[in-house]
Each structure stands twice: as structure tokens, then as C-alpha cells.
């Protein structure tokens, strides 16, 4: 708890420092949150048709799901499920020979993930699902959400998985940075660092209370300020090759811990 409070203080101090050190209205810089809010509104408007016609984006993996056979005996199936960070992760390079399945979709929030959890996870009969989400909920990609609403969605994902005998690994929400590229400040202002920390604290406790595995990317990827370490991302949000190199062994250890634990009930 003491470490969490120190991180929270450091992260909030960085928000203030970013605001104070930013020149008055330089090109491409959000001013009083206007440009950040404007870009989010543009994202929502640009995806309005998709939201109306296929909110969960069920078509994305429909054919791949239909072609997926039963798990190979003796090889527990593992699915990585989440948003763009999962979507861009080249699992075959990070986990050679493991045949892990990627079911990430860029930009998604937990309400969307709930819609597609059955076809993209449950029906594929994995032994383990590794879920990485939350950052787009905090940003408000599909509309404003309270922490309580996000937490409720996480709990629903866990309930669905466990009811179908699937072991759950909940990943921490990733740290972010505001000075790692032209889009970094926009991403930073859309994603409250204190909400990221609060959600991670809740996730860790929820996993402990319900017998799930907590995958702590945050501690390994945050610097002394509580922000994403330089060199692990090109835009302050999405990991690059170096970032995924940090994440892969942590994910593998979490998967092995989940498989070694009791069967989901």
C-alpha cells in the first residue's frame, strides 16, 4: 500500500509537471484538454457505424474462430484477449513454439469485450485466458465509464470464464508516458494516471480475493515517476519490441502459475 501511495503521488506530480512545462498552445499540444477531447470525439464519430452495426466487432475473428479445431490433447490452449496492445503483439515471436492465440482488437473497451467473449474465448475452449484491458475504458473510447463500471465488467469476464472452466489471468493496466512521440501527450491526457493506478490496485485485490492470477506489467515497465519507461514505446502507450520483450517472460510465468493452480470453478 505504501508503494502504491508513493507511485500515485509521483504520477500525479508528473501530470502537474507536464502541464507546467508545456509551452502555451504549441502546435499539436492539447490546450485545457480541448484537443484531447476533440480527438476522442473524432474517434467515436469515425467508428459510429461500427458501434451501431457490430459493437463487439464479432466479424473480426469470425472466420478464424470457425476454423479453430479442438485443443490438442496435452497442449493447454492459451488465449491472449484484449485491445490494441494485445492486437499488435506478435505472439509467435515472443513465445516460439507455444501456439498461443491472439484475440486482441485495437481500441476496444471492456463492454465490447464482453460482447465477443463467448465466440472469441469460451467457444475455443482454452485452459487459460490472459486479459489485458482497461486503458480504453479510462480514455472513454465507447463513452464515459466510472471505475466501478469498469470493475464490474472485469468481474463479469472472470465469472464467464470460470463458469466455463477457464483459468483467468488479469493483467495490470499499462503505465503511460507523455513525452514519447507526437501522440503521447494526447494519450496521456485521455488516460488519468490516478485511475490507472486505482484500477490496478483493484485488479490485484480482486485476483487475490478470487483465486485468479495477477500479471503485473506495471511494476516492471514504470520508471521512478510511475510512468512508462523511455525506450519501451514509440508513442507512450503501445509497447515496442523492447516493451514486449519485458512483458513476455512475465506473461509466461503468469500462464504457468495459472496452469499449476486449481481448475477453474
Predicted regions and their residues:
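N-terminal secretory targeting modules
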Residues: 1-79, 87, 91, 124, ...
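Acidic/histidine-rich helix-loop elements
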Residues: 41-55, 97-111, 139-145, 236
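Conserved beta-strand elements of the Class I
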Residues: 79-81, 101
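Short hydrophobic segments within beta-strands
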Residues: 81-82, 171
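Active-site metal-binding loops of divalent metal-dependent hydrolases
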Residues: 84, 105, 135-136
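Alpha-helix capping/helix-boundary segments
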Residues: 85-86, 203
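Short, solvent-exposed loop/turn elements at domain surfaces
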Residues: 86-92, 109-112
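Alpha-helical cap/lid subdomain in secreted, periplasmic
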Residues: 93-99, 114-265
Amino acid at each position: 500500500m505504501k508503494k502504491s501511495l508513493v507511485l500515485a503521488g509521483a504520477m500525479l506530480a508528473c501530470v502537474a509537471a507536464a502541464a507546467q512545462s508545456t509551452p502555451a498552445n504549441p502546435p499539436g499540444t492539447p490546450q485545457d484538454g480541448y484537443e484531447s477531447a476533440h480527438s476522442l470525439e473524432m474517434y467515436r464519430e469515425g467508428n459510429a457505424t461500427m458501434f451501431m452495426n457490430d459493437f463487439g466487432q464479432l466479424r473480426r475473428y469470425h472466420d478464424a474462430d470457425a476454423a479453430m479445431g479442438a485443443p490438442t490433447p496435452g497442449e493447454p490452449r492459451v488465449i491472449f484477449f484484449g485491445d490494441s496492445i494485445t492486437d499488435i503483439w506478435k505472439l509467435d515471436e515472443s513465445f516460439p513454439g507455444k501456439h498461443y492465440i491472439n484475440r486482441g482488437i485495437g481500441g476496444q473497451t471492456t463492454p465490447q469485450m464482453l460482447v465477443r467473449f463467448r465466440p472469441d474465448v469460451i467457444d475455443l475452449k482454452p485452459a487459460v485466458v490472459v486479459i489485458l484491458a482497461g486503458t480504453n475504458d479510462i480514455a472513454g473510447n465507447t463513452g464515459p465509464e466510472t471505475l466501478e463500471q469498469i470493475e464490474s465488467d472485469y468481474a463479469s469476464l472472470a465469472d464467464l470464464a470460470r463458469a466455463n472452466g477457464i483459468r483467468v489471468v488479469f493483467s495490470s493496466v499499462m503505465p503511460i508516458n507523455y513525452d514519447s512521440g507526437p501522440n503521447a501527450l494526447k494519450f496521456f491526457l485521455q488516460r488519468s494516471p490516478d485511475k490507472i493506478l486505482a484500477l490496478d490496485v483493484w485488479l490485484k485485490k480482486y485476483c487475490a480475493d478470487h483465486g485468479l492470477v495477477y500479471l503485473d506489467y506495471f511494476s516492471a515497465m514504470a520508471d521512478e515517476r510511475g510512468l512508462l519507461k523511455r525506450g519501451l514505446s514509440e508513442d507512450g502507450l503501445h509497447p515496442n519490441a523492447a516493451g514486449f520483450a519485458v512483458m513476455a517472460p512475465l506473461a509466461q510465468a503468469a500462464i504457468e502459475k495459472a496452469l499449476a493452480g486449481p481448475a477453474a470453478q
